[in-house]
UniProtKB/Swiss-Prot annotation:
Active-site feature positions: D131
Catalytic activity: beta-D-fructose 6-phosphate + ATP = beta-D-fructose 1,6-bisphosphate + ADP + H(+)
Protein name: ATP-dependent 6-phosphofructokinase
Species: Coxiella burnetii (strain RSA 493 / Nine Mile phase I)
Gene: pfkA
Family indicated by similarity: Belongs to the phosphofructokinase type A (PFKA) family. ATP-dependent PFK group I subfamily. Prokaryotic clade 'B1' sub-subfamily.
Amino acid sequence: MTEIKKLIVLTSGGDAPGMNAAIRAVVRTALHYQFEVYGATAGFAGLVNGQVVPLNSRAVANCIQRGGTILKTGRFENFRFKAVRDKAREFLKKLQIDAMIVLGGNGSFAGASKLYQEGGPQMIGIPCTIDNDIQGTDYCIGFDTACNTALQAIDKIRDTAFSHERNFLIEVMGRSSGFIAVNVGIAGGAEIIALPEFHVDIDTLTQKIKKQHGKKSASIIVAAEANQPGHSFEVAKQIKEKTGIEYRVCVLGHTQRGGTPTVKDRVLASLMGAQAIEALKKGLTEKMIAYQNGKIAVAPLPDPDNGTRYFADEALLRVNNIICAM
């Protein structure tokens, strides 16, 4: 087991509220154990381009309440090429980096894992995505904040929907999973929740709309983006053509990725960040800090080819149908 003296932390992929709380915990826990800590800016691109900054306790002060990431982030597609990873590995070797902590999702973990297998430093992943769709953990940093941001928007839209007696189709993020949609749909009292995991064809959807039409002065559909951002405009168009009922479309978009992290995201991010350092001290590598059954745990990395988690509790949709049908 290699003794860790120098550590690097980076954020990769899409940003998520709570990342800064995790960075802060990583840095200060590492400093507690006398590690020398660095941060790579703009994700894996920072390792290739030599964009690295030393991090001390003051560098992460006053960031726990901030959304986004102080280290910047991004997707770096070229990291899939070995020649590019070799350049990153040589740079880390030159800096004498012993371990790396990656905040991100499946693709980010896979990149760091390959780097380790090719002679790079020990690595631990911390799951950060508002989509909450990483296999092996019940919770990902950023999800709670994103849900609260979306819910605030839905509550405001419902105010105007009621005032004008209008119907709205609200599209939320989530990529190919429906965790955001089902949570904010139930919390926002949506009459219909549309998820990619339980696909409903347009004819079934319009029949449901016609059955509900007239019972209320306004109606809200919450739909997951289902890997097709903006698809709700076409859905609303088909609803109008088949039923004559108009639905105004509101795509919440990237507003869900920003904002001050909630208590839940700050606390879990802090605990996960600290646990990542403890895992490295035990000599662990190619692991993820997960939230399982209400506890912080160390788990295997998700399968890079099959690491997406999907919403599966159809009973929640049935409950919402009963509550919102009246």
